[in-house]
Regions:
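An acidic/histidine-cluster motif and surrounding catalytic segment
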Residues: 59-86, 90-91
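Conserved NAD+-utilizing ADP-ribose enzyme module
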Residues: 2, 8-62, 66, 90-92, ...
Length: 190
């Protein structure tokens, strides 16, 4: 299956490595917290909010939303493990798009405000995905969950983010859906 992938490290002729940065270690504490209870997850997020405030105060750019990303991924992994185990783990997978246009649109959304030096590091690749049944998900649900966790002030918001994860894995389409292809199978850059 021909798909498209953006990367700052990939090279033509090589295979993509699932979770090459080993980010699952950043997600695991949030999954463990949710397995305990929502209060534990909430407290872990509060710690992240404190770290975000400290990083912001000392102008450590590009770090202030990392905990939100990993907390959101933790919610999605918790829901996947408990309700949708047939799907691949998001963190230990690669992400693709079925068209160049979709990949370029995501690049503009994610990197549109970055300085030119950062933008120049990201390249678009055509990839041969060797997966007979890749998963297609509406990435808007992840973005919505991210926003909820970014603004987290109550336990009810955790339930909202969990519902967004269910929508994502359940195949529900949002109003302006944007599909991403998620696979942990072999993928070679051509």
């Amino acid at each position: 299956m021909k798909v498209y992938h953006s990367s700052d490290t990939a090279q033509v002729g090589t295979g993509l490595i699932n979770d090459y940065k080993k980010n699952i270690e950043l997600v695991r504490p949030f999954v463990i917290a949710l397995k305990q209870n929502k209060e534990c997850f909430f407290n872990l997020c509060l710690s992240g909010q404190y770290i975000r405030a400290v990083l912001g105060k000392f102008n450590m750019k590009n770090m202030d939303t990392y905990f939100v990303k990993w907390a959101s991924e933790g919610i999605f992994e918790y829901v996947r493990q408990n309700e949708f185990p047939e799907f691949p783990n998001r963190i230990e997978s690669n992400y693709f798009f079925d068209s160049i246009e979709s990949s370029k649109r995501l690049f503009e959304e994610d990197w549109g405000e970055a300085d030119q030096e950062e933008r120049d590091k990201i390249r678009l690749f055509e990839v041969e995905l060797r997966d007979d049944h890749p998963a297609f998900f509406d990435m808007n649900w992840f973005d919505e969950a991210f926003e909820v966790i970014y603004e987290l002030e109550s336990l009810d918001q955790i339930d909202t983010a969990i519902e967004y994860a269910r929508n994502y894995f359940g195949g529900k389409q949002s109003e302006n859906y944007r599909f991403e292809i998620v696979s942990n199978k072999e993928a070679v850059i051509v």
